[in-house]
Amino acid sequence: MRRRRLLKGFASLPVVASTAVAANDIPTYAHGVASGDPDNNSVVIWTRVSGLRKSQPVSWQVALDDNFEQVVCSGVEVTNQYQDYTVKAVAKGLDSGRDYFYRFACDGVSSPVGKTRTLPTGQLEKLGLALASCSNHAFGYFNAYDAIAHDEAIDFVLHLGDYIYEYGATGWGAETALSLNRAHTPINEIVSLQDYRERHAQYKADSDSQRMHAAKPLLLVWDDHESTNNPWVGGAQNHQPADEGRWIDRRDIAIRAYYEWMPIREPNVGAERKNFWRR
């Protein structure tokens, strides 16, 4: 694709919605941008486009500078309701151990700019890692994410799981959530695909979380609460088949939402999404 054509999607605001999107469906980026799963020469970039009601192309760029005068790779992805209007792209052909900037555009509306980094190679004098886990929105403390975002010594964020929690209005943390005005969305325990999507959306809408995701690439693995508490192959401590259906269905729904909403690569050919390890 010619760079001139791609840049049309990154026009300055305000913009007039084209016929591709209805006038009352102007795209927004309410959940920010994120990057993750880097290797030595590529990284996943992510966003979600709100305000769409049908399939729509989304342009993206990766550059050496935040003014995007030195674009090194670009492309177009198509998003739709079947992926909850999330967008993921693997930016390839990058240099190892280098910072990059990225952004998206849909129907002339540009996303916030994110900053990411590829994994280094060879011997290192230092490497800055932030460790995060067990991030229950109900309890607050997401200001730790803001601190990570502003720490220039941190290169990558290693998130060891429990990125979201599944509980509802009467579950763990509910009283604290009410006192902090951080009640769960949706209010019920999450079971359906729409439930899991809404819970991920709540976490990604948090301003501290958005700052971290826009500033640092994540290395991710899930734990148990991305689906529900203490699962095993045949069920989970916090799953009641009589009321919540088959465990395997809930597990697969949770994994689908996770892949939609997180900056993580799709499994290699022949691998399954439920396998969180790689060869």
Annotate each language-model stretch with its function.
Residues 29-30, 41, 83-85, 110, ...:
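Residues that act as N-cap/strand-start positions at coil-to-secondary-structure junctions
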Residues 21-57, 117-120, 130:
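Non-catalytic, glycine-rich low-complexity segments
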Residues 15-20:
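Hydrophobic h-region of N-terminal signal peptides that target proteins for export
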Residues 34-35, 79, 268, 279:
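Short Gly/Pro-enriched turn/cap motifs at secondary-structure boundaries
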Residues 57-126, 138-142, 146-147:
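Extended acidic/polar, glycine-enriched regions
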Residues 123-144, 149-278:
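Active-site neighborhood of divalent metal-dependent phosphoester/pyrophosphate hydrolases
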Residues 33, 113, 275-278:
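Short, acidic/polar N-cap/turn motifs at the starts of alpha helices
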Residues 1-14:
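N-terminal secretory signal peptides and thylakoid transit peptides that target proteins
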